[in-house]
């Protein structure tokens, strides 16, 4: 999937020119770049333990050191996960978007694993043309019900917008998304720090570590994760976390780019305007035309960033009359990015991406293709037969950082 040109063009592909001339027709290197980041988001879905009966429900299956070797990404050696992100929220939000294990002894009863921070390895930095720091936010593959349920009043975004939030306009964002981003729980072993501070602390550490290298910060997400990525990217740029504290006068500022798929609206016009004024910040928002979630909330909120509009209904590989979940499915978005040529140019896969992937977690592929629906199932649902002949659930690899949300 990689092109040598992607390394030399990375600033252009990350929005230095606001993607002018790259979207119609869709640049082939940009297609590959978007799919690479989409796979890194997909890793959060593959690794999440969603079985309510598991005491590990809401956690990540894998140790962060092994994450990219255990999930389906094209270049597992290019990035290393350095920190996992855990989020909690207030009571109005918690039960609507966070998973609670049925087991009272579960570790994630009040919070969930929401993604990770990763950094390009030496191998990856050589291939990518710089040291890329990635923040990946997990979302939800569910269709409309979750976003329609979150009917909460807006809240001030001044706290995450720094000086841009103190200009008297009082920009606002969705209270539910802000709660997930900023809530902490001193009684939780995983969430004594908010998701926000977990990420910002790790980015500051990595920016100091790689202060002598060319760096970039890429914040990615799908669905609910896209809204968190939007808040996080604005926060990083507004509060200068894209500089090293060890650099004199913060003279070196890493570009911050948000890449999001199927994103609901995050804030009002004031937030949009403040976002667009941040000089180091860019955002590319991939929207699938039949997906209704990007139109929510329908009143009082504004779209942010540059939009790449695709329409997966033109794909001959997918069901002609797909469900709402199909139009919102992340793998379907990546399929669209691989083959979209515009409304009047047909659909042809420019990037050779396996069409079987669209059935990984959904029923999207046309019946003529012999691919089972929702085929991504862990062997025996992670039940393992022990030497005594009894079956036990083994769905979680203990990680040294599980209870270490204050380090570094």
Swiss-Prot record:
EC number(s) given by UniProt: 3.1.1.-
Designated name of the protein: Phospholipase A1-II 2
Molecular function via GO: phospholipase A1 activity
GO cellular component, one term: cytoplasm
Keywords: Cytoplasm, Hydrolase, Lipid degradation, Lipid metabolism
Stretch list, region Disordered: 386-408
Residue numbers annotated as active site: 223, 291, 328
Coiled-coil region(s): none
Biological role: Acylhydrolase that catalyzes the hydrolysis of phospholipids at the sn-1 position.
Principal EC category: hydrolase
GO terms, biological process: lipid catabolic process
SUPFAM superfamilies: alpha/beta-Hydrolases
Biased composition (Acidic residues): 397-408
CDD domains, alphabetized: Lipase_3 (cd00519)
Key word Hydrolase present: yes
Subcellular location(s) per record: Cytoplasm
Top-rank taxon: Eukaryota
Keyword Cytoplasm: yes
PANTHER family in the record: PHOSPHOLIPASE A1-II 2, PHOSPHOLIPASE A1-IIGAMMA
Principal cellular location given in the protein's record: cytoplasm
Membrane-spanning segments: none
Family label: Belongs to the AB hydrolase superfamily. Lipase family.
């Amino acid at each position: 999937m990689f092109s040598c040109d992607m390394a030399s063009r990375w600033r252009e592909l990350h929005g230095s020119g606001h993607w002018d001339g790259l979207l119609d027709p869709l640049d082939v290197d940009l297609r590959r770049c978007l799919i690479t980041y989409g796979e890194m988001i997909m890793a959060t879905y593959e690794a999440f333990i969603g079985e309510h009966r598991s005491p590990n429900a809401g956690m990540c299956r894998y140790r962060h050191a092994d994450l990219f070797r255990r999930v389906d990404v094209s270049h597992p050696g290019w990035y290393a996960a350095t920190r996992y992100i855990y989020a909690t929220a207030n009571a109005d939000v918690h039960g609507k978007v966070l998973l609670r294990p049925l087991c009272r002894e579960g570790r994630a009863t009040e919070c969930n694993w929401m993604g990770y921070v990763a950094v390009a390895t030496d191998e990856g930095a050589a291939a990518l043309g710089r040291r890329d720091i990635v923040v990946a936010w997990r979302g939800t593959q569910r269709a409309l019900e979750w976003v329609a349920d979150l009917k909460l009043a807006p809240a001030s975004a001044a706290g995450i917008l720094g000086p841009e939030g103190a200009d008297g306009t009082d920009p606002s964002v969705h209270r539910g998304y802000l709660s997930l981003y900023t809530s902490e729980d001193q009684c939780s072993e995983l969430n004594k720090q908010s998701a926000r501070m977990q990420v910002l602390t790790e980015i500051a550490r990595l920016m100091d570590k790689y202060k002598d290298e060319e760096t970039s910060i890429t914040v990615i997400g799908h669905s609910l994760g896209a809204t968190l990525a939007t808040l996080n990217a604005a926060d990083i740029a507004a509060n200068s976390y894209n500089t090293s504290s060890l650099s004199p006068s913060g003279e070196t500022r890493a570009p911050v780019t948000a890449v999001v798929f199927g994103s609901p609206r995050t804030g009002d016009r004031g937030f949009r305007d403040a976002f667009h004024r941040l000089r180091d910040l860019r955002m590319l928002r991939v929207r699938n035309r039949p997906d209704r979630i990007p139109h929510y909330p329908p009143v009082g909120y504004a779209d942010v960033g540059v939009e790449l509009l695709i329409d997966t209904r033109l794909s001959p590989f997918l069901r002609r009359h797909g469900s709402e979940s199909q139009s919102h499915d992340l793998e379907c978005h990546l399929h669209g990015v691989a083959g979209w040529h515009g409304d009047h140019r047909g659909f042809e896969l420019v990037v050779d991406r396996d069409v079987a992937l669209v059935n990984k977690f959904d029923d999207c592929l046309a019946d003529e293709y012999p691919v089972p629906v929702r085929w991504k199932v862990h062997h025996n649902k992670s039940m393992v037969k022990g030497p005594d002949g009894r079956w036990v659930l083994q769905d979680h690899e203990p990680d040294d950082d599980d209870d270490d949300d204050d380090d570094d």
